């Protein structure tokens, strides 16, 4: 009888007790950042470009700009900014959902960075090996990701 009780206890204990599982989520998107993005960030949701009052959404690689009363997502800049140099313009990292909803705040807060003219280190010009995974970097290597 002792053996049966012991066996039932072990079986019941193994059914009731489940192994602990810890989930740690670290979101690093260095490889998906554009080469014209500034160095120093492991994760970026949006860049705000004060010179042209436009956002760039890193996960979908799209520019977000206001046109005719609505926000437009586009893979390229609007025609009026076709000559804008993304390498030289200042980029502000904004890590918040739908950053463009705070456009008025960003426009005021970051207006001092208009015409900043290339005084920000960008990924393409970095010698930090962690940026070599960014497609378009002069020392790019993909570690079998392509």
Q: What are the roles of these predicted feature ranges?
A:
Residues 1-23, 146:
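Classical secretory targeting signals
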Residues 24-146:
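Low-complexity segments
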